[in-house]
Amino acid sequence: MKSIKIKCPAKLNLTLEVVNKREDGFHNINSIMQLISLYDYLAISVYKAEKTSIELSGNSNEIPYNEKNLVYKAAELFLKKTGLKNFNIKINIEKNIPIAAGLAGGSTDGAGTILGLNLLFDNILSEIKMHELCAMLGSDLNVCLKGGCLHATSRGENVRKLPVKIYPVTLIKPKNLGISAKEAYTKYAMKKDKPKYYMTERMIEALKQDKDIKEFLYNDLEYAVFDDYKELQQIKSKLPKSIMSGSGSTYFILEDVKNIDFSDDYQIIKNIRFITDGCSEV
């Protein structure tokens, strides 16, 4: 039996600009994504067995522990692509990243699974191959695997490193509101007026020159869903400098906010920072 523990960081979209809809139903985006110090943890164990099996467990009752979970899909794909057989893989998921929040909680766990299994099997896959598997599983996995600050294009799976400028972060999420990517992109497509601010390019230049990036925070999907949810309007009214991450419903502000006057209907996560790495062994 071999075991490993992997920490899987959440991500923020510092910018998210929708370019167009693709023939495969996904959207091409232009986005800057930043990993932050909010982590899920995976405890992965591998046993020799008469037949191959994958078992999931965890601390959250909000996620499935079966083949519908991206962790399961990642383990299954890893075994298929490596040709490994007759192993029992057990993965315990310690969930700390909010669900359906625009923070890539599922994607980072999937990326962490690929990394952890590859380490347990003596780096059977190259870094390039790991990224290929991550791209097959979803749009945000490569960001979570590579880590730091990244310029993401295509549907989000094509990434290149950018300089990291460290900021404190406060997260605010309506507890009872999750917005699916499908809903957000559909509503964006229905908008007749789609302003173009080219914030991604402007933020890239600011990062390269080590300048403040706060004025360039932007999300097309916030524009798409904001008018439909009073919970989002409440956040923005109290924290005008905050911005939505991904398809929501989490908002973030690049400050250590000491006193936040929100009801118990909101989850507040403080003492978070930008980080320079991605999924990694604990």
What is the predicted function of each stretch?
Residues 16, 40-44, 140-144, 150, ...:
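Short beta-strand scaffold segments in enzyme catalytic cores
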Residues 50-64, 113, 208-218:
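Short, basic/glycine-rich phosphate-binding loops at helix/coil junctions
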Residues 14, 42-44, 71, 106, ...:
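Residue-level signal for inorganic ion chemistry
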Residues 92-121, 139, 241-253:
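Glycine/serine-rich anion-binding loops at beta->alpha junctions
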Residues 112, 118-162:
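RNase III-family endoribonuclease catalytic core
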Residues 17, 27, 71, 102-108, ...:
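Gly/Ser/Thr-rich beta-alpha loop segments that engage phosphate groups in nucleotides
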Residues 1-101, 118-131, 153, 164, ...:
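ATP-binding N-lobe of GHMP and related small-molecule kinases
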Residues 146, 150-241, 254-282:
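Conserved, helical-rich catalytic subdomain that frames metal- and/or nucleotide-binding sites
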